[in-house]
Amino acid sequence: MDAKLSSTGGEAQTEQRQPGPVFVRNSRDADVPAMLAIYLHHIRRGVDPGIEENEFETPDAEDLKRRRKSMQRRKMPHILAEDGGVVVGYAYAVPFRKRPAYRYTVKHSIYVHNDHLRHGVGRQLMGALIDACAAAGFRQMIGYIDSANRASLALHEAFGFGKVGYLPSVGFKFGRWTDTVMVQRSLGPGATEPPRT
């Protein structure tokens, strides 16, 4: 996987061509409606029937634009995958914790369009996101995964994430308690040397 990473104006630029039609690049404001549609599909799919939308917070396009710009100002990657000009997934990293001691650790999220699941989009986004986070100087990457999401667990394992925590019964949906697995991987030299300040 060859990623072209450069820094311009404090923002890591990620443009990654893969074999096949999917292209990974930094997100833009014009991509927000497509990203929002992907996000809302996954949020609504994860909510019990009978729970009204006004009972949980859903962002609108302006919220997502603000979040995206805030992430980019803090040198946090916000990337997407497109296939033939159509947005098929996106990924981003945010600070793991707000306190300064944790500034070299990020947590990440990846969302893939429902019609493009199991086509390698998540794999391409994960590789590009790891590369962008490492290039930005982050040293650890954290993820939280529903324990029933075997595909996501396998993807993270394939990219060197190890299981570092298990949170039993922290969610309730579809009539059952759900567990969360916490995964982590090192970026760049990880903890073998102090960060460059």
Which residues are covered by each model-predicted region?
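Conserved GNAT acetyl-CoA-binding A-motif
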Residues: 133-145
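Conserved GNAT-fold acetyl-CoA-binding loop/helix
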Residues: 36-67
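Acyl-donor-binding surface of acyltransferase catalytic domains
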Residues: 1-18, 164, 185-187
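Acetyl-CoA-dependent GNAT
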Residues: 4-7, 56-115, 126-127, 186-187
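Glycine-rich phosphate/pyrophosphate-binding loop shared by adenosine-nucleotide-utilizing enzymes
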Residues: 22, 86-90, 178
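A short beta-loop-alpha structural element at the N-terminal edge
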Residues: 23-37
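Conserved acetyl-CoA-binding loop-helix of GNAT-fold acetyltransferases
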Residues: 118-132, 150, 154-158
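Conserved catalytic-core motifs of GNAT/GCN5-like acyltransferases
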Residues: 92-95, 142-145, 157, 162-179, ...
